[in-house]
């Protein structure tokens, strides 16, 4: 029997992958229905007009349009999707 543990294999060296969270579509980017705009843990960003929120707090687009971020009193940040037809008339 060996009196020393053989070197060469480590019992450490494992780690999990990052969760790939964050903003996926930034302000003034075009989106189509179902596009993921933000992946997050908790509600750092809140759903606004024409967007939905999944059960894991993912914010996604409900219509085709342009992403818009807006801040409200209290520091809340809302995410909206504005239809392109509204932007072309301005």
Swiss-Prot record:
Keyword annotations from UniProtKB, A to Z: Ribonucleoprotein, Ribosomal protein
One Gene Ontology MF term: structural constituent of ribosome
Keyword Ribosomal protein: yes
GO cellular component, as recorded: ribonucleoprotein complex; ribosome
GO process terms (BP): translation
HAMAP family, A to Z: Ribosomal_bL27
Designated name of the protein: Large ribosomal subunit protein bL27
Organism: Anaplasma marginale (strain Florida)
Gene designation: rpmA
């Amino acid at each position: 029997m060996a009196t020393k543990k053989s070197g060469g294999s480590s019992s450490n060296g494992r780690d999990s992958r990052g969760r790939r969270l964050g903003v996926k579509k930034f302000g003034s980017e075009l989106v189509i229905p179902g596009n993921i705009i933000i992946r997050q843990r908790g509600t750092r960003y809140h759903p606004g007009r024409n967007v939905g929120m999944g059960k894991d707090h993912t914010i996604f687009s409900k219509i085709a349009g342009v992403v818009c971020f807006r801040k409200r009193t209290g520091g809340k940040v809302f995410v909206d999707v504005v239809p392109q037809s509204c932007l072309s008339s301005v």
